[in-house]
Regions:
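Classical eukaryotic N-terminal signal peptides for Sec-dependent ER targeting/secretion
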Residues: 1-50, 56
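GH16 jelly-roll
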Residues: 40-316
């Protein structure tokens, strides 16, 4: 699989600031690792999040493992628990959440995005811990006009209490990577995303690494490894910012919009040592190739926003 050098206008930085908070007595970092442009709104996307549930490996059942959390009937579990659908109309969107929290292990799930004109809509899959100092990892698929690519907006939010100062610190870090296609140049049928949260935090698309976020706690960089997270998905309207910075609004004549989730698989492990695979030299070379040829924006080189590069940039 190759990244297509598709040119597009990047979304404004202010989009990421909506995810930042400045609560008192908190130390906050937000990592918006990837804006990744997918090729087609009709395709199915495969997610692998390396996390841990309180149960063992299994082909999970939506009836058993999740609750439809909101939407007043717009979220439905079908096919004996094997399919979950979310819908969005002008009144409301919908979403579900897992019954169990996760820390170490793996979740696989297939997601089919809103087809056709999905402008203004956001389809999500994310992990979030409880409490006022939560960690969060977000996949947000930002809809677009018919035939135009989706944009994958990936956020990391990490928080901890500040013990020696009443000041709070906020940060937003971003990268943008252009479109993925088949080696023949045709549109991809699907992409498989993987997150390893524990050794380096490695993001891959179809086994091609596109981001490595190493555990750099030794130099004062927060890393998400201590707080169990609950799994969430949602479909909602964000036409004030989601498509071309809010210039393209949701076409409600196309409602209801529908996204679907299936083939959820959950694996659990007793501790963080179960996943020990490091990037080999080939993977590291592929990562550098992607960054060189298809990275549109890299927060590590944005001196206007970060006169001094964030600490993790030295090791990523």
């Amino acid at each position: 699989m190759l990244f297509s050098p598709t040119i597009y206008t990047s979304l404004p930085s202010s989009l990421f600031l909506t995810f930042l908070t400045k609560p008192p007595l908190k130390h906050t970092h937000t990592y918006a690792h990837i804006l990744y442009k997918t090729m087609s709104p009709f395709k199915i996307f495969f997610f692998t999040a390396l996390i841990l549930a309180a149960f063992s490996a299994s082909d999970a059942d939506f009836n058993t493992d999740v609750n439809v959390a909101w939407g007043n009937g717009r979220g439905k579990i079908l096919n004996n628990g094997q399919l979950l659908t979310l819908s969005l109309d002008k009144s409301s969107g919908s979403g579900f959440q897992s019954k169990t929290e996760y820390l170490f292990g793996k979740i696989d799930m297939q997601i089919k995005l809103v087809p056709g004109n999905s402008a203004g809509t956001v389809t999500t899959f994310y992990l979030k811990s409880e409490g006022s100092t939560w960690d969060e990892i977000d996949f947000e698929f930002l809809g677009n006009m018919t035939g135009d690519p989706y944009t994958l907006h990936l956020m990391f939010t990490l928080k901890e209490k500040v013990t020696k100062s009443n000041n709070s610190i906020s940060g937003s870090t971003q990268q943008q990577i252009s479109t993925l296609t088949q080696s023949s140049g045709t549109l991809k049928e699907s992409c498989k995303l993987k997150i390893s949260r524990f050794l380096p935090d490695t993001l891959t698309v179809d086994d091609t690494p596109i981001r490595e976020f190493k555990n750099s706690e030794s130099i004062g960089v927060l890393f998400p490894k201590n707080k169990p997270m609950r799994m969430y998905t949602s479909l909602w309207n964000a036409d004030d910012w989601a498509t071309r910075g809010g210039l393209v609004k949701t076409d409600w004549s196309k409602a209801p919009f529908m996204a679907s989730y299936r083939n959820i698989k959950i694996d659990s492990k007793p501790n963080s040592n179960w996943y020990t695979q490091q990037m080999d030299s080939t993977s590291q070379a592929r990562l550098r190739w992607v960054q060189k040829n298809y990275m549109i924006y890299n927060y590590c080189t944005d001196r206007k926003r970060f006169p001094q590069a964030p600490k993790e940039c030295a090791t990523s």
